[in-house]
A protein has these predicted regions:
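N-terminal Rossmann-like NAD(P) cofactor-binding subdomain of oxidoreductases
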Residues: 1-139
């Protein structure tokens, strides 16, 4: 049996509907180690408080400010539209080896004018759109 390195991940927006489903799936993946679960409310609570299906012992919910970015390989963003682009813009230029998977609409539409028309939000990270890839992984 070969040994695989575990991927160190964070889930930002972990206590929302999509975030909880993602945490459940990641908690069962043999090659994923969840290092951080982040939200803006209910800090310090166990993730199982929000979803009883999550049985694995995981880090307690914390704020984004507590993330140790250098210890991560991948960040999942399950945030409202308009929020992921701000965070990615801020963090991408500081650590270009970080990979982000955004579950919102922020990098779904590559034309900023169409994005604005659909979501009534000005895109704040236009230069980063070229680094993004949108797909529907059917989580």
């Amino acid at each position: 049996m070969s040994k695989h390195k575990k991927l160190n991940v964070a889930v930002i927006g972990a206590t929302g509907y999509t975030g909880l489903d993602l945490v459940l799936m990641l908690s069962k993946h043999p090659y994923v180690k969840i290092n951080s679960l982040c939200a803006t409310k209910n800090l310090g609570k166990k993730i199982s408080f929000f979803d009883k299906r999550i049985k694995k012992k995981l880090p307690k919910v914390t704020s984004i400010n507590k993330i140790k970015w250098d210890n991560l390989d991948l960040i999942f963003l399950s945030l409202p539209n308009g929020e992921a682009q701000k965070l990615i813009k801020k963090k991408f230029y500081k650590n270009k080896k970080l990979k982000f998977i955004d579950l919102s609409a922020d990098f779904r539409i590559i034309n900023p004018k169409i994005y604005k028309k659909n979501y009534n939000i000005n895109h704040k990270a236009i230069k980063l759109i070229k680094y993004s890839l949108y797909s529907v992984p059917e989580l």
